Each structure stands twice: as C-alpha cells, then as structure tokens.
C-alpha cells in the first residue's frame, strides 16, 4: 500500500472516530439536560403539591361566622291606620317605608313551589344533589376562563348566598377558594331548605326589592304565596342581572329572561306541558303594577 493510501485510510478513520465522539458527547449532554429538566419538574411538582395541600388545609375549616337565622338585615317597616271606610277597628296598611333595601322576610313554607323551582332551575339545577359546590360547573368555569379568557358562572345558590351575606365580591382565586370551602361547610350546618329560604329572602330582585316577598309586592301587588308560575319565573329571571332584567325598567329583557326560566323549568320536569303553555302565553302580556323607588326614604329607623 502506498503512503498516500495509508494516510487517507488513517485520516478517514480519525474522522469517523471524531464524529462518533462528537455524537456521543451530544448524546451525553442531551441525556444530562433531560435528566436535569425532569429533576426540576419533579421538584417543582413537589413544591406546588405541598403548597396546594397547605393552602387546602388552611381553608378547609373556613366558614362565614354568620347565623342564617340571626342575620343583620334591613327590613321594610309598615304604617297602619284604623279602617276609614268601615266601622271595624281592624288596622289597614297605609304605607311601606324602607331605606336602601325593601325587604319583607317570608318563611319557607309560604314560598310557593313554583318560586323555588324557578330559581333552582335557572340558577343551580343540581342544587338538591350537590354538597354546596357543583364541581361540574366549577370545572366548566375554570376551563372557560383559561380557554376563552371570559367568565362563566359556576357559583351555586349556596355560594351566591355566601357572597351576598359576606359582601366578599373581589375577583381572586383566594376569595373563590374561601367561598368554596364556606359553601361546603355551610351545607354541613344547614339544610337545603334553610339555605334556599335565606337565599330567596336576601338576594336583589331589582328596583330596590330584596327577597321574593318584596319583589312580588312591587311587581305584582300581591304576596309571593299568591304568585303563579309565570310571575315566579319573571321574578327568578331578575337575579342574574337585576339592573338589566328589572321588569319596571326593561320589560322586554325581563320577558325574554322569564321565558328562558320557563324553558328550563319545563326541560327539567318542574312544570307540565299544559302549565308551560299557559305560562308562556301569560308571559306575552304581563302587567307590572309597581312604581320604581316608591316610598323610599333616607335613614329610616327600622322597627318591627
């Protein structure tokens, strides 16, 4: 073999050895980098898990520290006078007085089934099944928030009650976590009926009315126990946005929302086909008798 051939042969082998060494080095670097990344991910996962567990443990006993039967609420006061048109001495209601909130408490058994079914159908259809938190809706709300960047209501009636009682409405994960654990603990302390009764007596139903009794008085001139299905649906539809769905201010918007409530009640089997048709027909010509802000005065002493 000539010297030039030997040199070529040796050179080619050196190149192959060098390439192999380089590939081997790159492989080692890649493995080392991957190993480091996995280690970082594991450590991060442990830190996040420990932090999450610690956060949950710190929140698990979170409660409202409120007694649903002793809430400090503003109530409407009434002025009565002796009957002027007859010889009886029975007092007649002359005027209702209230300041910032028009509210008349009504017991659970005085609230018609139609009102209870309407509010549950539109606000929290799994109310009677969950333990304070509807995890399917909560997951849907979180998914929507991260995928579309928009909010989606995931709060149950229990959670909404807590928000109304505490006044905590800031948008933060900490507040939402507190609300969740408060809801879980509230349902351990009170029955579904007690929670629903409190909700229906506390929440805002637009035009200064708080609670279903005040809403029925304002919009229909009657007690809530005398309201029919269509009227209850009109009241229930207000809660999502009292300013936008007040029948005194936006009757058309209220009618559309009312019909959405009726559709939900029908789809969920809360009303029959005949009741649905009657209520839908009534919704087309609803009459509201109230006057916005009637008898509202400032700084009225509340007495019962």
Model-derived segments and their meaning:
Residues 2-304:
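Juxtamembrane regions of bacterial inner-membrane/periplasmic proteins
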């Amino acid at each position: 073999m000539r010297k030039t051939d030997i040199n070529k042969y040796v050179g080619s082998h050196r190149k192959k050895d060098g390439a192999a060494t380089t590939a081997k080095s790159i492989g080692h670097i890649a493995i080392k980098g991957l190993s480091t990344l996995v280690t970082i991910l594991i450590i991060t996962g442990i830190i996040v898990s420990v932090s999450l567990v610690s956060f949950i443990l710190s929140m698990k006993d979170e409660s409202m520290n409120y007694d649903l039967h002793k809430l400090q609420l503003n109530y409407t006061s009434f002025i009565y006078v002796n009957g002027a048109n007859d010889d009886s001495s029975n007092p007649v209601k002359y005027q209702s007085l209230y300041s910032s909130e028009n509210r008349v408490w009504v017991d659970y058994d005085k609230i018609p089934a139609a009102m209870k079914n309407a509010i549950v159908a539109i606000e929290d259809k799994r109310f009677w099944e969950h333990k304070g938190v509807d995890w399917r809706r909560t997951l849907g709300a979180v998914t929507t928030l991260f995928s579309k960047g928009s909010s989606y209501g995931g709060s149950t009636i229990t959670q909404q009650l807590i928000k109304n009682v505490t006044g905590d409405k800031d948008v933060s994960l900490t507040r939402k976590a507190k609300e969740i654990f408060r809801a879980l603990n509230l349902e351990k302390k009170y029955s579904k009926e007690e929670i629903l009764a409190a909700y229906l007596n506390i929440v805002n139903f637009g035009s200064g009315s708080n609670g279903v009794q005040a809403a029925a008085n304002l919009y229909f001139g009657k007690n809530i126990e005398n309201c029919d299905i269509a009227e209850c649906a009109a009241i229930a539809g207000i809660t999502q946005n009292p300013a936008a769905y007040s029948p005194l201010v936006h009757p058309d918007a209220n009618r559309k929302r009312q019909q959405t409530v009726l559709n939900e009640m029908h789809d969920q089997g809360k009303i029959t086909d005949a009741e649905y048709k009657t209520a839908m027909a009534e919704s087309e010509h609803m009459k509201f008798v109230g006057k916005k802000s009637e008898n509202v005065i400032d700084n009225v002493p509340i007495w019962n």
